[in-house]
Amino acid sequence: MLKSIKLSCLTVVLIGIITTFAGCSVVENIEKKLGWKTDYFQYLDSENVEQISIQSTRDLGFKFIVTEGSAKNTMYNLLSKAQKSTEKSNLEPDYIFEFDLGDEVKKFYYVVGSESGNFYNDTDVYTVSNRIDEVIIQNLSFIRKPKEFNYIYYKPILEVLKKIEPSLKDKDYKIGINIKSDADCLKYIFSNDLKDFTSDAEKIISNIELVQTTTAGYDVVITVKNRGYDTLVYKTAITVNNKRENTEEIYYVVAQYEYKKWNISISEPNVKPSNW
């Protein structure tokens, strides 16, 4: 282990020395031989790329186009460090990337996160460790993503599950969580996060799963619908529809980001707060 660390450090030092006395092409060749850089995305490092489009798979209205030269170069620098993989991720893709070369469009699917084989198409599979979508999104002024989105989105749902768990305990109900219609937040929801959330939800209610297509086959459906947000304020309604007992309960969530943390308030069933 120590020998491996020393070897890695020595390699970095050597590259640093070479960088001082040689051109970038020499360093790039070394990186390629070490497997730190790939030639496949070389076409991004040229004027042949007219534009790069990035489309959310969950929110079809969320698509942005990259045409600016420095942004395309940034994309190339990230993808050139992708590692060739043998198998693609088994999670649903979060984005579709299309590289328009004029006479050809190269299409890739991207699973956000460090999941192996998370950038792929029908013929090639790569692992991208960096969040390539954030490089672009962070420069979009119209994005008002709530701070610590994963926490403020999934935490209230888990808290509602804890509230309803006693009434569902020991009942042979098929329970589904429906977030597919939560249009305002779909652009921020990613497969790796859903996997973690589902695991946490199953610890509270074992017979629960995410609704994939239709709610028809479920006895209890928990629907999440955002009612407004900005970076510091968040409101959502979580509806629990028990088809077996013909009941419906709505939990109103109001959260404020203060002193570097979210203060979350969840109402009693069907009691709308005054600040809603």
Label every PLM stretch briefly.
Residues 1-10:
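Bacterial N-terminal signal peptides that target proteins for export
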Residues 18-21:
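Bacterial Sec-type N-terminal signal peptides, specifically the leucine/valine-rich hydrophobic h-region
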Residues 24-276:
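Function-determining sites in protein domains
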